[in-house]
Amino acid sequence: RVPDHAEITTIEGVGTLSDMHPIQVAWMAYGCAQCGFCSPGFIISAKVLLDNNPSPTREEVRDWFNKQRNLCRCTGYKPLIDATMAAAAVMRGEMTKEDLVFKQTGDSIVGTNYIRPSAAQKVTGTWDFGADDALKMPEGTLRLALTQAKVSHANILSIDTTEAESMPGVVRVITAKDIKAAGGTNKINGLVMLPKHNKTDGFERPVLCDEKIFQFGDAIAIVAADTEEHARAAADAVKVEIEELPAYMNAMDAIAPDAADIHPGIPNAFFETNCIKGPDFDWDSIPDSQQVEIESYCSRQPHLHLEPDCGYGYIDEDGMITVHSKSIGIHLHMPMIADGIGVPMENLRLVQNHAGGTFGYKFSPTNEALIGAAVKILERPVSLVFNQFQNITYTGKRSPAFMNIKLAADENGKLLALWGNNYVDHGPYSEFGDLLTMRLSQFTGAGYGINSIRNKSTTVFTNHAWGSAFRAYGSPQSYMGSEIAIDVLAAKMGIDPFDIREMNCYKESEGSTIPTGYPPEVYCEEELFKTARPLYEAAKKRVAEKNAASDGKIKYGIGVSLGVYGCGLDGVDTSNAFAELNPDGTVTMYAAWEDHGQGADMGVLVSSHETLRQAGIRPEQIKLVMNDTKTCPNAGPAGGSRSQVMSGNACRLAAENLVAAMKKEDGTFRTYDEMVAEGLATKYEGNWVTTFCADHPIDQDTAQGDPFATYMYTIFLPEVAVNTETGKVTVEKFTCVADVGTIMNRLLVEGNFYGGLVQGIGLALSEDFEDLNHDTTLKNCGIPYLSLIHISEPT
């Protein structure tokens, strides 16, 4: 309890936009404010520490943040420690605030530590998130709450809203019948991507459940009231009579012979993909000593974004139903919800809020249809803000996968064949499940020249949390199959796990091809292994020395794995952006490059400036209008590692088209007034399309084709300590050697690397969402704190 008359300092009292505290400056300089949701808490915490301990060690900073229970889901923590140490040096007078900040020396900012445009607002507490916006909505705004399912599978017999409608402050209780009466189908369009072997049409998910409950938390009714407290109380008073049904909480239970269809008439195993590459392989032709078979499981990893799901809606000045949310696919979500709520696409507008992290869960619509339906039916502004329990239990999760992989090699360790039979638990709704499962065909065994692959993967409906996109979408499931199999095979054959990977990596001299049958766009892995070799050997020496000094209770080891991932949506992908010259000589970029903390604002800025600088445009002269379907062209979703490739190139092309129009014959550039005087347009579109992917589309029978414009490649070298008595694993050092293409902004690349590493460690060691009675808090879901990762170094 805070004592009476205590002085309380908030982020607003630390520093302002015009007079920042050294900690705030350091937070910007080290790229700490990614989504920015945790920044005020960390900055306040760091200030208290440095006020009392002006010269802390790195370990003392870590311990302090742990003690205060400060959490970050974006950065992987290392930049936060770096920034705190740098701020301490400034506060001790050893350097100035100006020394911390990147100083542009040339006219290009590509590959530099240029600070993202939103950083200053994020570190001063002036960057409003969705719940902040909701507090500022006009008088008469209705607050929404949901009546949600308390079981995982049931038939709905009746819904009685009588008591709820009579409770204080309640304006209306909306159920499925109201949505249908307003012209909606009450169905989310799951957008079937691969129809040939898909047994569903994608319309299983209701906006509001009226006949069945398919998972815990399913929305049954929306209560609109004058306050959130009144709305929540009334939502609890809605009476739902059910007939509870057996709940199939994993894929294997759902495909058991006696399992009933979760969606009547649609089999629970609703999609299948087969990777069929090269000739058949005779597994009896090689001895058992040269082949292995493994079974593995990739858990139902929760995203654990710190900002609970939230949004609001209203009818705008043009009569458009407008929904603000954390969507990372504003144009993608429009066709998914429009018919369901009975709003024509041309009358629907989606806007992305400043999002406190999503890590992919907002590739799926969550609250958009609920808010849109409420706005249409009520014709008043509304807001819907989840608490953390709702956030964890009723947003999508990484789809678990049961992997069964066989791997064979010749007597020297050269890989000959891979076989697989895998099951993906995608929860009760199909949306993007086919695309996810296709990733298992594309990335199981990726990175290695394996000539014969027979790998079958099946997508299964269950009654657990619906499957949604998560960082590296589909590849963790794949690599928990093939990378584990390679380790087991290496151990069985007495080959070093680094050596067997280096021996089998993609090589142009061998004509290596990816699992889908085509050459990679670059052959870079040999160079990566060459670079990683001395780092690996040094790590082996370190862990050997530690083991020699250990009493055996703690054992140390070095791991190695290879990751490859495609950039883009399968096949022909496209993105659009606008560049507009303004009367004052500035340029406005319009881009629906959604930002969930990864740095879309910086992406638009650096991608456009590299061209606009030819016309003398400085970074600070570029204005950004982003993530509004009313003003920005369709750039596609910010998922699938596609944004810098697709939207970055769209911004580049828009800038090129503008600069080309501005350029005079003598090489100088027209002003805005000159453009207008000559009748030239001042706004230009950039459209980037991967037309070359049309040459080799994915074969839905064999998964063969060339689906992505480009790939990323990384060698991972974690050093771990294992307590042999408890089995607890601690990651002590993590080194990566990567080819991620052109680094447009170093702070963004490093920050996303660190954050991805920590989420990968969490997936491996602690994070899961399985027990609905336990896994309902950030802590219980296994979110990592600082003590788990001692140091991580992308190389």
What are these regions (language model features)?
Residues R1-Q104:
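Signature of N-terminal electron-transfer/Fe-S-associated modules in redox systems
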Residues Y30-F37, W466-S478, G640:
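A short glycine-threonine-serine/GTX helix/turn-capping micro-motif
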Residues P79, T84-L142, A181-P195, P279-I294, ...:
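Cofactor-centric catalytic regions
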Residues A88-I266:
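Flexible, low-hydrophobicity surface segments
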Residues T141, C310-E317, I450-A472, D584-Y590:
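Residues forming anionic-ligand binding surfaces in small-molecule and nucleic-acid pockets
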Residues M345, P497, R618-P619:
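Alpha-helix N-cap/start motif
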Residues S787-T795:
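Residue-level detector of conserved catalytic or cofactor/ligand-binding positions
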